[in-house]
Curated annotation (Swiss-Prot):
SMART domains: Cation_ATPase_N. It comes from Sus scrofa (Pig). Mg(2+) binds at residues 715, 719. Residues 107-129, 307-318, 791-800, 865-916, 969-983 are extracellular. GO terms for cellular component: axon; basolateral plasma membrane; melanosome; membrane; plasma membrane; sarcolemma; sodium:potassium-exchanging ATPase complex. Residues 80-82 are annotated as: Phosphoinositide-3 kinase binding. The chain crosses the membrane at residues 86-106, 130-150, 287-306, 319-336, 771-790, 801-821, 842-864, 917-936, 950-968, 984-1004. Its EC number is 7.2.2.13. It is an enzyme of class 7 (translocase). This is Sodium/potassium-transporting ATPase subunit alpha-1.
Length: 1021
């Protein structure tokens, strides 16, 4: 944290270029931020503090000095994260990835039209129309995607309420409330319960002060703050309070040591906003796909350009061919299909409580192979709950379920009544007003987490605590402090059969036991002998080992003769007994796991996803929760477990024998990257405890080095750098801090880890369905492009026009392609390993070979069959067509003879040609029926999957209706050059459609019968 600490170590050798310098500086700054928090203010004595900051420790700074510092350091505010200007976002949608390919297509069309317009007297307008339509497609889908993202980002308009509005400072001995942005380094600040800490403070005096650091360190318990230096690590010491955490109770004074971006919170926010998010896997896939399509298009275009020149076409004609082939290869409708598919999934996920901020993140979640999850609030319920009691020398289990449906215990025992009385009276937590109608567990409580847990437990078991406190009036109390480690209060006893005053005490179990000489067993006091002390010790160790926070409880009836009615109890100079008390029992609390989490973790495991817990909490608690939710599965041991079982020192155990592993933050700090890689590689079940935000980031980078796609979940500010660095960051909608929501790609509206698993399933499904959509869309490229190629090579009249191609890509194929996004998952979706982004591509060789090489070729054969049938019916036999093109297209020749010697004028010839375009188009529609049905599944038979997808059935009818409309609607001959066709011509394609269906069903059958065989390797996409 020190300004400029260790800068010199990082100075690179003279960097020549300005750009390199900038990059080097950015990397250096990031390294600087990734280092652990370095500050030494917590080690300084008050004198040294006074010397360092020039502050009078009782009167504060002078207003003049404060103004100077404010001018030097700037306001005490976080720099808002850099936002991308809206026009840049819009341009990204218009010119990114796939759109670029369509723009190139459009420009080439305009170019071709320009060439034709310059060289022909009456140029055809096909290319002009095509260029206009392509531009329109890009602009419309671009606007659509931009609108989607803008809608999501509106939900994210926060971060502003991170900064506290007012702060109480002491300047020149006067208390004044000022805007928190005007607080400067060296200011003397006072905070009380309920305030937000306005800057990083070094505490110089405190009274019962506790702060909630959960958003920074992930610890759910409020932390005591005092002037004492208690730990080398500034995040753990008691005498530093951090900017933007909350003071829960008590009061404190402190000197401001850092403000704004230099605070610990500021560094984390800067760290998060400075990280490069990187490209999403689906964006990389689409880029890879564009490379393939562009490669194929350019290769074919150039090959046929050269071929045309060899076949003695003019170079102008050759250029027109080149452009035609490239454009025919571009699947115009696919950009819209992909955008719509992702949007549909995002909407479906929002219904399941996952809000996706970035459309492409939908798929990323599906390819996730490692989830680094925060513990508090994500895996657990984020409410301390009483878990166990130890009284009458036995452990009782309490009900920790969210809906109180679990086990209960005997509530009539005299010891339990005494224990519940102490827990209710020696407790400062109270329910907030007007909540009588709410269930007890849902009520808001003023007080710390442990006391709230006790309050709710006693209210559930024994009725109103408020009434109990009214009956037993409180006379005096000594609040909990870190030196004594106990809390004590004395109450009037309404029960006349017992002494008038009851002293109750709770605190750290070993401290409480030391003050006791007897113990309550079945309502009777017994001397506390060694045997009972051992029983206590065993119970304490057992509950502590479960990761629970244990408190001890004792009481004492004060004898009436020494403490008569009206006795003045003095808590400063204590005039009542604090020893020889009667020990009543232990109560332990834990933040229990959420009910749905163990099942979700199990699903992750069967889907091949590794779940790693990363928490700021204590290792024992972390390990207990990890075992509770199945992150460490039953029977798997850590190195410590093996050492305990074999009764040998930990150092003698081979770490690789242990499948599970709990790593402490302090050990992680000293590890090299190689050691961390070793842990991540050789242990399947890992828990990182007591980690700092910087370490979370290092863990994520370690997982990414292993080639994992990492999802990070968390709700605190401490999770945001890791969340930003991960492939997908998941923030909590309810408990999440604004900084973490800012950095995330997805927000769980119900804060439940189980929703992530739903997300993973949806992500995998969308990847499968996108593959199916692409396979469907690409297949029709072959029957669209082969007519063009045969037209050039064999010199026959053009079988299919450019405008007709557009009618397929943007008309008949659109709805069916989108309908595949609604297809249900195949049975193996959550049983297979996560996809490997390096090898499992969205568009792979197998998909191209199936779409282009096999199904596409059958479709093209069907098209040509129809074409030759119709021309033969009109008198032109196939053999007669070869080499006919030059005369056919010459508008000055009006006596071209057919196979039977009839003469055809230019106009008549063109009508026959366009009449052929329409059946060729209809044939493609008919064979695409079969293609759509076979694309429903990749491995299962269509008969297994069924036809439950209503949108797909609608798609089949829609494409048929559209084809019929385009063929038979009056005026289409002029607009699109489509002519009505005889009903019999529809049936030419049926055998080919059936062939496609049978061929693919047989292929899938072989894949299922012979997994891993040749057919699967070559054709399973």
């Amino acid at each position: 944290m020190g300004k400029g600490v260790g800068r010199d170590k990082y100075e690179p050798a003279a960097v020549s270029e300005h750009g390199d310098k900038k990059k080097a500086k950015k990397e250096r700054d990031m390294d600087e931020l990734k280092k652990e928090v370095s500050m030494d203010d917590h080690k300084l004595s008050l004198d040294e503090l006074h010397r360092k900051y020039g502050t009078d420790l009782s009167r504060g700074l002078t207003p003049a000095r404060a103004a100077e510092i404010l001018a030097r350091d700037g306001p005490n505010a976080l720099t808002p994260p850099p936002t991308t200007p809206e026009w840049v976002k819009f341009c990204r949608q218009l010119f990114g990835g796939f759109s670029m390919l369509l723009w190139i297509g459009a420009i080439l069309c305009f170019l071709a039209y320009g060439i034709q317009a310059a060289t022909e007297e009456e140029p055809q307008n096909d290319n002009l129309y095509l260029g206009v339509v392509l531009s329109a497609v890009v602009i419309i889908t671009g606007c659509f995607s931009y609108y989607q993202e803008a809608k999501s980002s509106k939900i994210m308009e926060s971060f502003k309420n991170m900064v506290p509005q007012q702060a109480l400072v002491i300047r020149n001995g006067e208390k004044m409330s000022i805007n928190a942005e005007e607080v400067v380094v060296g200011d003397l600040v006072e905070v009380k319960g309920g305030d937000r800490i306005p800057a990083d403070l070094r505490i110089i005096s405190a009274n019962g002060c506790k702060v909630d650091n959960s958003s920074l360190t992930g610890e759910s318990e409020p932390q005591t703050r005092s002037p004492d230096f208690t730990n080398e690590n500034p995040l753990e010491t008691r005498n530093i309070a951090f900017f933007s955490t909350n003071c829960v109770e008590g009061t404190a004074r402190g000197i401001v040591v850092y403000t704004g971006d230099r605070t610990v919170m500021g560094r984390i926010a800067t760290l998060a906003s400075g990280l490069e998010g990187g490209q999403t896997p689906i964006a990389a896939e689409i880029e890879h796909f564009i490379h393939i399509i562009t490669g194929v298009a350019v290769f074919l275009g150039v090959s046929f350009f050269i071929l045309s020149l060899i076949l003695e076409y003019t170079w102008l004609e050759a250029v027109i061919f080149l452009i035609g082939i490239i454009v025919a290869n571009v699947p115009e409708g696919l950009l819209a299909t992909v955008t719509v598919c992702l949007t549909l999934t995002a909407k479906r996920m929002a219904r399941k409580n996952c809000l996706v901020k970035n459309l492409e993140a939908v798929e990323t979640l599906g390819s996730t192979s490692t989830i680094c999850s925060d513990k508090t609030g994500t895996l657990t319920q984020n409410r301390m709950t009483v878990a166990h009691m130890w009284s009458d020398n036995q452990i009782h289990e309490a009900d920790t379920t969210e809906n109180q449906s679990g086990v209960s215990f005997d509530k009539t025992s005299a010891t339990w009544l005494a224990l519940s009385r102490i827990a209710g009276l020696c407790n400062r937590a109270v329910f907030q007003a007007n909540q009588e109608n709410l269930p007890i567990l849902k009520r808001a409580v003023a007080g710390d987490a442990s006391e709230s847990a006790l309050l709710k437990c006693i209210e559930l078991c024994c009725g109103s605590v408020k009434e109990m406190r009214e009956r037993y009036t409180k006379i005096v109390e000594i609040p909990f402090n870190s030196t004594n480690k106990y809390q004590l209060s004395i109450h009037k006893n309404p029960n006349t059969a017992e002494p008038r005053h009851l002293l109750v005490m709770k605190g750290a179990p070993e401290r409480i036991l030391d003050r006791c000489s007897s113990i309550l067993i079945h309502g009777k006091e017994q001397p506390l002998d060694e045997e009972l002390k051992d029983a206590f010790q065993n119970a304490y160790l057992e509950l502590g080992g479960l990761g629970e926070r244990v408190l001890g409880f004792c009481h004492l009836f004060l004898p009436d003769e020494q403490f008569p009615e009206g006795f003045q109890f003095d808590t400063d100079d204590v005039n009542f007994p604090l020893d020889n008390l009667c020990f009543v029992g232990l109560i332990s609390m834990i933040d229990p796991p959420r009910a749905a989490v163990p099942d979700a973790v199990g699903k992750c495991r069967s889907a091949g996803i590794k779940v790693i817990m990363v928490t700021g909490d204590h290792p024992i608690t972390a390990k207990a929760i990890a075992k509770g939710v199945g992150i460490i599965s039953e029977g798997n041991e850590t190195v410590e477990d093996i050492a305990a079982r074999l009764n040998i020192p930990v150092s003698q155990v081979n770490p690789r024998d242990a499948k599970a592993c709990v790593v402490h933050g302090s050990d992680l700090k000293d590890m090299t990257s190689e050691q961390l890689d070793d842990i991540l590689k050789y242990h399947t079940e890992i828990v990182f405890a007591r980690t700092s935000p910087q370490q979370k980031l290092i863990i994520v980078e370690g997982c990414q080095r292993q080639g994992a796609i990492v999802a990070v979940t968390g709700d605190g500010v401490n999770d945001s750098p890791a969340s930003k660095k991960a492939d997908i960051g998941v923030a909590m909608g309810i408990a999440g801090s604004d900084v973490s929501k800012q950095a995330a790609d997805m927000i769980l509206l119900d804060d439940n880890f189980a929703s992530i698993v739903t997300g993973v399933e949806e992500g995998r499904l969308i990847f499968d369905n996108l593959k199916k959509s692409i396979a469907y869309t690409l297949t029709s490229n072959i029957p669209e492009i082969t007519p063009f190629l045969i037209f050039i090579i064999a010199n026959i009249p053009l079988p299919l026009g450019t405008v007709t191609i557009l009618c397929i890509d943007l008309g008949t194929d659109m709805v069916p392609a989108i309908s595949l996004a609604y297809e249900q998952a195949e049975s193996d979706i959550m049983k297979r390993q996560p996809r490997n982004p390096k090898t499992d591509k969205l568009v792979n060789e197998q998909l191209i070979s199936m779409a282009y090489g096999q199904i596409g070729m059958i479709q093209a054969l069907g098209g040509f069959f129809t074409y030759f049938v119709i021309l033969a019916e009109n008198g032109f036999l196939p053999i007669h067509l070869l080499g006919l093109r030059v005369n056919w297209d010459d508008r000055w020749i009006n006596d071209v003879e057919d196979s039977y010697g009839q003469q055809w004028t230019y106009e008549q010839r063109k009508i026959v040609e366009f009449t052929c375009h329409t059946p060729f188009f209809v044939t493609i529609v008919v064979v695409q029926w079969a293609d759509l049905v076979i694309c429903k599944t990749r491995r299962n038979s269509v008969f297994q999957q069924g036809m439950k997808n209503k949108i797909l059935i609608f798609g089949l009818f829609e494409e048929t209706a559209l084809a019929a409309f385009l063929s038979y609607c009056p005026g289409m001959g002029v607009a699109l050059r489509m002519y009505p066709l005889k009903p019999t011509w529809w049936f030419c394609a049926f055998p080919y459609s059936l062939l496609i269906f049978v061929y693919d069903e047989v292929r899938k059958l072989i894949i299922r019968r012979r997994p891993g065989g040749w057919v699967e390797k070559e054709t399973y996409y």
